[in-house]
Amino acid sequence: EHEAALEKQQKEYEKTIQALRQQLQEQDETAASSQMEYVAIQTQAAGKTIVLDEALTRVLIDKQLQEEGWEADSEELTYQKGARPEKGHNRAIAEWPTNYQGQKGRADYVLFAGLTPIAVVEAKKENTNVAGKIRQAERYSKGFQIAAPLVPAFDLAGRTIAWPDDNDAHYNVPFVYSCNGRPYVPQLAEQCGTWFRDVRSPSNTKRALEKFHTPDGLLDLLKRSKEKAEQALKAEPFGYLKLRDYQEKAIHAVEGTLEKDSRRALLAMATGTGKTRTIIGLMYRFLKAERFKRILFLVDRNALGQQAIDAFNEAPLEQNQTLSKIYNVAEMGDMAAEAETRVQVATVQAMVKRVFMNDTPPPVDAYDCIIIDEAHRGYTLDQEMTEGELATRDASQYLSSYRRVLDYFDAVKIGLTA
């Protein structure tokens, strides 16, 4: 009886969504965007009580792609209806045909940055292991046929050929996603979230994201070579940093950890051993080698943030210049995240407000490296951590927010502790 009632409810929701879609088709172009928003809201509400099929899931995914700067409409922007990539447009085109080893298929979405196919998206219904379905997106990447006027992604990356896989085939599209429109919940990790993999290297593993990357974020990731940056770091001398031996070893240890494809590192240095000086040296090396685009230096108190700013303004580096003289360092309160900003100093509280209490939160690719000062304090949660603009009801609520800030950004995390 319960199953019959649930099936009846699901049919009613599907009927409602279908009616909304019909209304959308009948609207003129001026009303289309607001109507699509309404459809997405209704679909999201329906998804709380029923299992959404793949078609309804795409309504949610369309909206999520739009929020990150992609032109997306899986009803209208389809290959069959004549949608094609266009210079100056970041477009998600649905149902793009592929052919991998004679097996024809259709990618749910291919994301184009201008004329360059940069990512494949596999959309799945809700009760599906979305993490496991990323292999299907990988097959579509290998089966994508590049022909004029398309510009291959490997061209933009400075290569002459696509990226090889383990079986004598090549990935023609460098990034792949698998998702079902549901937000990421760690307890249900493989059943939700936006799963992502950079297929350019066999050692790159899939990972869950809060959102899709922006077009600019994917283009930066495409053009930023981890291998070249690591070579530059190995060739970069330490002399001008005037560090002690153990400080240089600490920097080498962090760089070596990241070279092994780990995305997390913890640096423990006792009080009085020059932790701040060491981390400034590490940050400068990262930026000079173009290992990272933008670093978020995260603190839990205004006082620690100001100490960091003072150190960035005073500690001499190459040619006796300071970090803030060489690179654009955004101080606390300056949260504009302009393109030229290379280092952002912020409190956890300010980032919680910016990410979770803002109508226009930053994209997940706003920072690709986060350095957490006094990282252990995020877990001890002493009374000092309530300082700042954000008032929290209890420690568990704050801890949840602290971790959510770290997990929100698609970034390498480096914790500092005594």
Description of each model-found segment:
Residues 1-294, 299, 303-319, 340-343, ...:
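ATP-dependent helicase/translocase motor core
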Residues 75-78, 327, 417-418:
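Acidic carboxylate-rich catalytic motifs and surrounding loops in phosphoryl-/glycosyl-chemistry enzymes
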Residues 162-164, 283-284, 329-333, 355-359, ...:
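A generic local structural motif
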Residues 178, 344-347, 371, 411-417:
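Structural recognition of the conserved hydrophobic beta-strand(s) that form the central parallel beta-sheet
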Residues 302, 324-334, 348-353:
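Conserved helicase motor
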Residues 319-325, 377-378, 414-416:
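Acidic/polar loop patches that form or flank catalytic/metal-binding clefts of enzymes
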Residues 352-355, 379:
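Activation segment
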Residues 362-414:
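SF2 helicase catalytic motif II
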